């Protein structure tokens, strides 16, 4: 059965509310070519989205090193603040600063992944996490699609290339990417893909798509 909230958003296309704060000096970095020393080019990628959308899972799935996570147990004080809707009760921890991982794409490129905290009270950390990033992945749960509005608005405001990745949760209706694009009102140049955050191949293909787009954009502005 289709998500009512998604179709209501698609039908009305209201302005996205609750955007993350504007840039405090944060700026997108342009990917550079191969270094003169022959060392791999490193790129910073930010993984953003709502609370309990799967950011920690995505980073952990693809990272070739033990991912650094900064999770804390959900306490009674979190009730009414950290609400995960349909997945409430399944999530016992929450990211309070960031997730960090690394993946090597070929012999000449290394990606450093930074996952943002999903709660509104940690939005002040975004400027530092995004500083120097070449692109972002906005992870979406279609049952709570409005939770990703701040991330979409933030990347659009900074002019940072990003990909919208719809996380494929078990037992959840799979909307066509076109429906999600309409619900988010993102332009045609922003890729919208289906991505199971638990599937390494899905995550890798999403990151490759993002990097290719960031490189093309950098070449166009060179």
Spans of model-derived segments:
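Active-site-adjacent beta->alpha loops and helix N-cap segments on the catalytic face
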Residues: 147-149
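Inter-motif core of Ras-like GTPase G domains
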Residues: 119-144, 153-158
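Conserved G1/Walker A P-loop phosphate-binding module
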Residues: 2-88, 92-94, 101-112
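A short helix->loop->beta-strand "cap" motif at the edges of active sites that frequently abuts
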Residues: 158-161, 189
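Conserved beta-strand segments of the P-loop GTPase G domain that flank and frequently precede/overlap
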Residues: 113-116, 136-141, 164-168, 194-196
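Canonical P-loop GTPase G-domain recognition
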Residues: 170-222
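A general structural detector for well-ordered alpha-helical segments in enzyme core domains, enriched
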Residues: 151-154, 179-180
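Flexible phosphate-sensing "switch/lid" loops adjacent to ATP/NTP-binding sites
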Residues: 2, 102, 121, 186, ...
């Amino acid at each position: 059965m289709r998500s009512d909230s998604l179709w209501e958003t698609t039908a009305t296309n209201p302005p996205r509310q609750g955007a993350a704060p504007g840039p405090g000096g944060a700026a997108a970095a342009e990917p550079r070519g191969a270094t003169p020393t022959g060392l791999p080019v490193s790129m910073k990628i930010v993984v953003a989205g709502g609370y309990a959308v799967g950011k920690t899972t995505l980073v952990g799935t693809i990272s070739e090193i033990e991912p650094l996570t900064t999770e804390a147990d959900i306490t009674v004080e979190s009730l009414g603040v950290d609400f995960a809707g349909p997945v409430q009760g399944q999530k016992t921890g929450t990211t309070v600063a960031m997730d960090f991982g690394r993946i090597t794409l070929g012999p000449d490129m290394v990606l450093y992944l930074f996952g943002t905290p999903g709660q509104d009270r940690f939005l002040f950390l975004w400027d530092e996490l995004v500083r120097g990033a070449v692109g972002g992945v906005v992870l979406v749960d279609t049952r709570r699609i409005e939770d990703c509005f701040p991330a979409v608005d933030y990347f659009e405001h900074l002019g940072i290339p990003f990909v919208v990745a719809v996380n494929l949760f078990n037992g959840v209706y799979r909307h066509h990417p076109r429906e999600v694009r309409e619900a988010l009102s993102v332009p045609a140049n922003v890729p919208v893909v289906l991505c199971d955050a638990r599937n390494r191949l899905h995550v890798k293909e999403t990151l490759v798509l993002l990097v290719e787009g960031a490189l093309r954009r950098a070449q166009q502005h060179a």
